[in-house]
């Protein structure tokens, strides 16, 4: 919840972020690679105060919102960025152009030919 209040790394081209359901605590092993800037996936910083005097979200302004109401709101958590592609973005763009359709429980965006990442390394 502290990360929600402060914001975090941004979902911009080439970053890796944790996939999850609507429950912000559900991120486990799936991730996605941002192939465009997706700032709407970033955590929404919560200004100081209780109540929060002025809060803006999705082009709307809210006033005097109880802090606990904001900190416990799943919509504000965003998707946690934990890495970045530093080499091989051309491969990611090829993956992006793979034809997709429905698959398993998903109605769309599933590659028609499975994509396998054979190698990835951590650079500190």
What is each stretch, according to the model?
Residues 1-124:
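Cross-family detector of peptidyl-prolyl cis-trans isomerase
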């Amino acid at each position: 919840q502290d990360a929600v209040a402060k914001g975090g790394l941004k979902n911009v081209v080439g970053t890796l972020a944790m996939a999850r359901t609507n429950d912000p605590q559900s991120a486990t092993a799936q991730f996605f690679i941002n192939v465009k800037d997706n700032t709407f996936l970033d955590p929404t910083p919560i200004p100081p105060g209780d109540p929060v005097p002025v809060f803006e979200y999705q082009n709307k302004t809210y006033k005097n919102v109880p802090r606990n109401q904001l900190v416990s709101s799943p919509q504000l958590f965003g998707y946690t960025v934990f890495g970045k592609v530093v080499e091989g973005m051309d491969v990611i763009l090829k993956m992006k152009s793979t034809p997709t359709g429905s698959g398993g429980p998903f109605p769309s965006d599933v590659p028609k030919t499975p994509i396998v990442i054979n190698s990835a390394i951590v650079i500190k």
